[in-house]
From Swiss-Prot:
The gene is hisI. This is Phosphoribosyl-AMP cyclohydrolase. Its EC number is 3.5.4.19. Keywords: Amino-acid biosynthesis, Cytoplasm, Histidine biosynthesis, Hydrolase, Magnesium, Metal-binding, Zinc. It catalyses: 1-(5-phospho-beta-D-ribosyl)-5'-AMP + H2O = 1-(5-phospho-beta-D-ribosyl)-5-[(5-phospho-beta-D-ribosylamino)methylideneamino]imidazole-4-carboxamide.
Amino acid sequence: MVELNFEKSVDGLLPAVVQDYVSGEVLMLAYINKLSWEKTLETGQAHYWSRSRNSLWLKGESSGNVQVIHDILVDCDSDTVVFKVDQIGDAACHTGHRSCFFRRVHQGELVVEGKPLFDPAQVYGSK
C-alpha cells in the first residue's frame, strides 16, 4: 500500500483536493487520515475524516452523491493528495452546489455563482 506522511501533521490529517476527473473542476477540499486513506484505496470510493463529527465519512453516505476514484496524485512530500473522481449525483458540496467553490471574490465581495442542485434540508434534514 502507498504510505502517506500522516506524522507530518499534528492531528494526523492531510488535505485531499478533489477534482472532477474529466473536466478538472475542483469540487472540494477535505481531509484524510490513515483510516480514510485505507478505506479509499480498499473500496475505490472517496472516504474522508469529518473534523466536525470526528469520524470516518464515506462521501455520499447521506446524500447519495458518491465519489468514485479514477486517479490519485500524491505530492512530493507525501502529505497532500489529489483525488480525481467521477462525481455521482452531480453535487459535491453539502450546500447542494456542484462544487464547494461556488463563491467568487468580485470587487472585494463574495458573489454566489450557480444554483444548488438539491435542497440540503430535504437531504440531510433540518439542523
